[in-house]
C-alpha cells in the first residue's frame, strides 16, 4: 500500500498526520500538487510536482494509483476514479468514500452545480465548508489509523 495525497488543498494538520502515519507504519506517502510542498527529508515521503493545469494532479494520481492504495482527497470525481481503479479514499474530514456512497455524492455535487449554474442558488446562499477543526482532525486520524496499518 501507498498513500497518495491530493496535496493542493490538504490542511496542514492533516498533512502532519499523514507524515506521522507514514513514518509510524513504514508506508510510502506521495504528495502530488502543481507546486512544491515542504516535506521533511524521509525515504517514505515523496513530493511530486505536476504541471499547472486543470486536474493535472488528479490525472497523475489516477494514472499511478494501484489497487489497495489509499488516496487522501475531498475531490468527489477524483475519488470516483480512484475507486474505479480499486483504490481506497479518505477525505481530510475522515469520510471514507466507497462504492456504496460515491454515486450519491457525485449526484449531489452535479445537482448543486446545476442549481448554481441556473441561478437558483446564489453564491451567498451556499454555506461553504466549515473551518477545519478538532473534530475533523480526530475523524481523519481515526480513519487514517483504520485504513493504514
Curated annotation (Swiss-Prot):
- Database matches in InterPro entries: UPF0178
Which residues span the membrane? none
Q: Name one Pfam family in it.
A: DUF188
Q: Which family does it belong to?
A: Belongs to the UPF0178 family.
Q: What is this protein called?
A: UPF0178 protein Psyc_0274
Origin species: Psychrobacter arcticus (strain DSM 17307 / VKM B-2377 / 273-4)
Organism lineage: Bacteria, Pseudomonadati, Pseudomonadota, Gammaproteobacteria, Moraxellales
